[in-house]
Amino acid sequence: MKKLTIKDIDLSNKAVIMRVDFNVPIGKDGKVSDDTRITAALPTIKYAVEKKAKVILLSHLGRPKGSFDPKYSLKPIAEHLKNISGLNVIFVPHVVGEEVKEAVKNMKVGDVLLLENTRFHPGEEKNDQELAKAWAELADIHVNDAFGTAHRAHASNVGIANFIPSVAGFLMEKEIDFLNKVTYEPDHPYVVVLGGAKVSDKIGVITNLLNKADKLLIGGAMMFTFLKAQGLKVGSSLVENDKLDLAKQILEQAKEKKVEIVLPVDAIVAQKIEAGVEKKTADLKDGIDDGWMGLDIGPKTIKVFEEALKNAKTVVWNGPMGVFEIEDFAGGTKAVAEMIAKIKGTTVIGGGDSAAAVAKFGLESAYSHVSTGGGASLEFLEGKDLPGIRSIADKKK
């Protein structure tokens, strides 16, 4: 790890302003319904408290338009954090200003202050320097533990670093370490499994990882763009017709780079995307009938993928194999989740839908790393330089 981390600095009696990612779902009852991201930040928060720091937390929730919106308040998150951590969590219903300064002044060592949703301030997403400076003036050190927003240059994760030193929290450190390994230094054989709806969302990842991977397994709705590009009949399946040439180019590039692209050989098809409808298995070389659409990979494909993954030393998986939210079309995603879980090497699950899928199947702890950032992990795998990582101070050589 070339970046400074929270372990590299003395925190005793220091005020720490920490950017965490508490962008979690809130249920109809107004309570947190999935606290994965909150528990992921706990080790960093607790470490700072143990080291006798005063901890000020910053997070966004949802997409309020730069002004107060009660449904995006962090108040229920403060209550949840207090309940699960046993820490003295104090909620301040302001983002910045005199009330915040006063609350910080009254903090004792070991207190954890959670400020209101950073995106209630119009300056947050613009990386407004005045706002960043106001936050920086509350503390001695900035800790960035919000990998989920690493691909965004906002005031709370990037701006503050212009005024006080910024270091990585434990979650950020783990994300950087694992994603660095699979992007730049993978052990071989290296297999990349991609799914999800659109080729356009994954084009950067495919282009970058074709330089490193030995095999690329493609499932999800994006497979139909590749299959149609090869001249196969895909019925009413989702296809990006404007990306057919691109799919052909990718297949050509893979051939040149000697990367084996493994496409599905069968699919579970139905006439509607809903539970309980008639479904059947279609052999893809015979094509899918009009009016039917592919909604999951089929049983033969599962066997083909299992064979392709057999001796893998590194696996990255990003994107589900089908419409896994509906039980009828979750079989392929579940099978892939289970086969990757058995692999002895380094296994990394990209954030977003793939992370949601492995959580649904109760397999989160079976992998080397499940990323907490959907968009951020994709951009990292594309080889991009992320602003929320660049702004963290480097270790001295």
Swiss-Prot record:
GO terms for biological process: gluconeogenesis; glycolytic process. Its main location: cytoplasm. Pathway: Carbohydrate degradation; glycolysis; pyruvate from D-glyceraldehyde 3-phosphate: step 2/5. Gene3D superfamilies: Phosphoglycerate kinase, N-terminal domain. It is found in: Cytoplasm. The keyword Cytoplasm applies. Substrate binds at D21, F22, N23, R37, H60, L61, G62, R63, R119, R152. It holds the Pfam family PGK. One of its GO terms (molecular function) is phosphoglycerate kinase activity. InterPro entries: Phosphoglycerate_kinase (IPR001576), Phosphoglycerate_kinase_N (IPR015824), Phosphoglycerate_kinase_sf (IPR036043). CDD domains: Phosphoglycerate_kinase. Keywords: ATP-binding, Cytoplasm, Glycolysis, Kinase, Nucleotide-binding, Transferase. It comes from the Bacteria. Belongs to the phosphoglycerate kinase family. Monomer. This is Phosphoglycerate kinase.
